[in-house]
Amino acid sequence: MPIFKKTLIVLSFIFLISILIYLNMYLFGTSTVGIYGVILITYLVIKLGLSFLYEPFKGKPHDYKVAAVIPSYNEDAESLLETLKSVLAQTYPLSEIYIVDDGSSNTDAIQLIEEYVNREVDICRNVIVHRSLVNKGKRHAQAWAFERSDADVFLTVDSDTYIYPNALEELLKSFNDETVYAATGHLNARNRQTNLLTRLTDIRYDNAFGVERAAQSLTGNILVCSGPLSIYRREVIIPNLERYKNQTFLGLPVSIGDDRCLTNYAIDLGRTVYQSTARCDTDVPFQLKSYLKQQNRWNKSFFRESIISVKKILSNPIVALWTIFEVVMFMMLIVAIGNLLFNQAIQLDLIKLFAFLSIIFIVALCRNVHYMVKHPASFLLSPLYGILHLFVLQPLKLYSLCTIKNTEWGTRKKVTIFK
């Protein structure tokens, strides 16, 4: 990033965080809500501060035998074809590209892929297409490919994702460090322009990678290598394949949360990192109902895998601390909101109500300050995501925790997003 843009981001963050500190002290002081505000501000400063120090890996990647694995279920035909074309266009050679259809009821996509592979023989010599007779879930679809490949490195790609031509090459630069066992790229919404929800989702994605994963990467322990674009060393996948396919939680089989699970396997071996120069765009839900179902699935996966991460507190305290921070911030927010609503000692007049709303807006702007130089106009929508996060996504997260044993996590009937 040019020094001018980076300086602008840092100065803007300092300005916004200063206002946030003042408003929090004025509005809530040393109350429960005020204490939460202090902890939140501290956490923001730590995460944003680390993200400002982040630098991507450089150098020429070593020679690896790489296999791409693309599971698909009832995917849009053109979307899957675009995914395949983007993988074929990689600047780093792939030894194998597996497309595994997981028993789709709508076979248009896999038929289109088969026709394309048969027609474009010269460029598709290393493409292997497989149709499963029954729907077993994403993990089993991936495992079909893992079991048949002797690759040194596996590239995982979601079926609704476009990966940039140099994405794999950039990811593999991180593997020049032999202590790195998994890496993920930067994700944005391909359909960002569709409506307000997709714009807000893109803002959230940019923060999740450009801030959260950048900060975690600096410590060598990102918590999730995202499904749309990640690489894993063979040692991460193959020894854990049976565990991966047959994972259970509270006595029930686990079918999703694959990326978090694989990341935990990688953490057991070494470092997991983020490579900002490896980029991809993915389709995101544009209807609120589908979006909330997706978030519900992700929330349940977050809580399940967080339990596993916290257990690593002796072997890998940094991973446990990142996880504990996320869980504690969620729990404290619930307590703070309850205190705000039901504690009669806190009297909200119009001025304080305006200040409270201002805090929500400024927190959102602080979280997404990186987005300011990328899409300045859309950056101003960040407060809307703050409202969505506080009044919709946080209650949904609590609901997900309370219903974590319910395996009916919801999918889209026509097109399932595997995330």
From Swiss-Prot:
The answer to whether the entry has keyword Glycoprotein is: no
Q: Could you identify this protein by its name?
A: Hyaluronan synthase
Q: PANTHER family, per this entry? A: HYALURONAN SYNTHASE, MANNURONAN SYNTHASE
Per its record, the protein catalyses:
[hyaluronan](n) + UDP-N-acetyl-alpha-D-glucosamine = N-acetyl-beta-D-glucosaminyl-(1->4)-[hyaluronan](n) + UDP + H(+); N-acetyl-beta-D-glucosaminyl-(1->4)-[hyaluronan](n) + UDP-alpha-D-glucuronate = [hyaluronan](n+1) + UDP + H(+)
Q: Which UniProt keywords apply?
A: Capsule biogenesis/degradation, Cell membrane, Glycosyltransferase, Membrane, Transferase, Transmembrane, Transmembrane helix, Virulence
Q: Could you tell me where this protein is found in the cell?
A: Cell membrane
E.C. no: 2.4.1.212
**Which chain regions cross the lipid bilayer?**
8-28, 33-53, 318-338, 345-365, 376-396
Query: What gene is this protein translated from?
Result: hasA
Which Gene3D superfamilies has this protein been placed in?
A: Spore Coat Polysaccharide Biosynthesis Protein SpsA, Chain A (3.90.550.10)
Task: Give the required cofactors.
Answer: Mg(2+)
- What is the membrane topology here? Multi-pass membrane protein
Pfam families, per this entry?
Glycos_transf_2 (PF00535)
The main location is: membrane
Give the similarity note. Belongs to the NodC/HAS family.
Answer whether the UniProt record assigns the keyword ATP-binding to this protein: no
